[in-house]
């Protein structure tokens, strides 16, 4: 990012088009690109976007006190900015400065919508008109992964179908894209489409279901109510006292930001994180690559690194400090805390907390986990970060890696089990709702590993504690999905669970998991096809976690700066490993909108079961 306005409210949620007032000046998203693009599609690997959009509802819970504090300029009856130069300039700042992750809406009013547009093509949510994320015009629907108007939808479709190479921008690729001038610079318009999340791959997830639209409306109303309460009480979020880690037992504490999460155990984040420290010197690209790769290797420990020992040798090795052996394991369960077998969700939660050690003091949590005896615990971490008893590890013959695994070919012992604490099967007597609760809670044991990995990202601890918590709440599921991808056998359409039982996509789909698992398989296939190295996977995981357009950020400028650093390091590493595959970095970035969609689908599915249970 080259420039950034201190008033830039990245990730704003809802903006109402009113009849008076003005919008603060904002930095346009296009100014966040590099200046070395040559206009071709492949050159986007050098001028990549610095932040990426969430799912359609990914930013609905942002701090609304910011987005409601400014009102855009008035519009004339035909929907264009008023004739005054000040209004025109302010309108340009509003539409172009709206962040990619925001959901732009306007109250339905005859003076806000151009009379030339058919009302049947207007996307509404109970009287609120959604705006195009690219140009700010009235959105006609959910196209290519974002709300967009017919003009931008057709422009993006032509661009990708015909592989058009647009002329180089004459204004340093810093054009503002609004409705009245969107056709002036096609290169900047296409970049804007990509930066807000438009993707050919996103179309396969279909249009927004009715249930999701209803949830979006409910979250909008909740955001408005929260904004009114905050503005009336004159109590900004920044006045919250900073929580420092204490060496005592961890007790429950309220989350510092009103950002709901489907995962369990997020209330412990403030105690596990460190207060913001003074800014450290910006590390070099090589330092970022080495530090992130080391943290990823040591914290997200893979089966072929430390889970290849037999049960007998495991305890002995830990006692003696010698490296673990690589003999196959038996499959009986020895010493693993029993999983709950009743229908009590609280019991399941306590079982997970027991495995995680969430009630332990933060001081007992090691700063790093070297592969070997440093981690004194019965449960080890597999390739998805989930705790696993050593007796549940299966040492596969050399070279027998799961199909489409990014680590295929360079690992000796591969864990062939999906790390679910409680695997779903119809004979257990559990309802579909309880199975889905277990499915979501199975990700909980990896939360601590994600937190520890984040603390070792260079510059992450320089962020405010509020922003650290916000990033972790919003990005943990996506991080786990990246690491979970290798456990899907895309070729056979199966998943191997902890019981060593293979479940097909058809079997799991019969229990109501079809849509989400199909999307997971699809994402896993696309990610694994890139054959990322361990270093690339670690840096990509860091980029997924550090996204400046998350909801409720306090200091988005600092997050964007950190994200820029990680993106530069990832791009340098990808081009270094495969210099001839210039489009590989772009393909990798296009997985970010897919992750947002998966995150949204998981949240919606979990929410729907909870609503049905009430």
Swiss-Prot record:
PROSITE patterns: NR_LBD, NUCLEAR_REC_DBD_1, NUCLEAR_REC_DBD_2. Residues 244-261 have a biased composition (Pro residues). Residues 284-614 form the NR LBD domain. Coiled coil: none annotated. GO terms for molecular function: DNA-binding transcription factor activity, RNA polymerase II-specific; DNA-binding transcription repressor activity, RNA polymerase II-specific; E-box binding; heme binding; nuclear receptor activity; nuclear steroid receptor activity; RNA polymerase II cis-regulatory region sequence-specific DNA binding; RNA polymerase II transcription regulatory region sequence-specific DNA binding. Residues 1-70 are annotated as: Required for phosphorylation by CSNK1E and cytoplasmic localization. Residues 14-34, 69-102 have a biased composition (Low complexity). The modification N6-acetyllysine is found at residues 191-192, 400, 591. The keyword Signal does not apply. It holds the Pfam family Hormone_recep. Keywords: Acetylation, Activator, Biological rhythms, Cell projection, Cytoplasm, Differentiation, DNA-binding, Heme, Iron, Metal-binding, Nucleus, Phosphoprotein, Receptor, Repressor, Synapse, Transcription, Transcription regulation, Ubl conjugation, Zinc, Zinc-finger. Heme binds at residues 418, 602. It is found in: Nucleus; Cytoplasm; Cell projection, Dendrite; Cell projection, Dendritic spine. InterPro entries: NHR-like_dom_sf, Nucl_hrmn_rcpt_lig-bd, Nuclear_hormone_rcpt_NR1, Nuclear_hrmn_rcpt, Znf_hrmn_rcpt, Znf_NHR/GATA. A zinc finger (NR C4-type) spans 132-152, 169-193. Residues 1-12, 35-48, 233-243, 311-324 have a biased composition (Polar residues). One of its GO terms (cellular component) is dendrite. One of its GO terms (biological process) is regulation of circadian rhythm. Ubiquitinated, leading to its proteasomal degradation. Ubiquitinated by SIAH2; leading to its proteasomal degradation. Ubiquitinated by the SCF(FBXW7) complex when phosphorylated by CDK1 leading to its proteasomal degradation. Rapidly ubiquitinated in response to inflammatory triggers and sumoylation is a prerequisite to its ubiquitination. Residues 1-128 are annotated as: Modulating. Residues 1-119, 233-285, 311-345 are annotated as: Disordered. Transcriptional repressor which coordinates circadian rhythm and metabolic pathways in a heme-dependent manner. Integral component of the complex transcription machinery that governs circadian rhythmicity and forms a critical negative limb of the circadian clock by directly repressing the expression of core clock components BMAL1, CLOCK and CRY1. Also regulates genes involved in metabolic functions, including lipid and bile acid metabolism, adipogenesis, gluconeogenesis and the macrophage inflammatory response. Composed of three domains: a modulating N-terminal domain, a DNA-binding domain and a C-terminal ligand-binding domain. Belongs to the nuclear hormone receptor family. NR1 subfamily. Binds DNA as a monomer or a homodimer. Interacts with C1D, NR2E3 and SP1. Interacts with OPHN1 (via C-terminus). Interacts with ZNHIT1. Interacts with PER2; the interaction associates PER2 to BMAL1 promoter region. Interacts with CRY1. Interacts with CCAR2. Interacts with SIAH2. Interacts with CDK1. Interacts with FBXW7. Interacts with HUWE1. Interacts with NR0B2. Interacts with NFIL3. Interacts (via domain NR LBD) with HSP90AA1 and HSP90AB1. This is Nuclear receptor subfamily 1 group D member 1. It comes from Homo sapiens (Human). The gene is NR1D1.
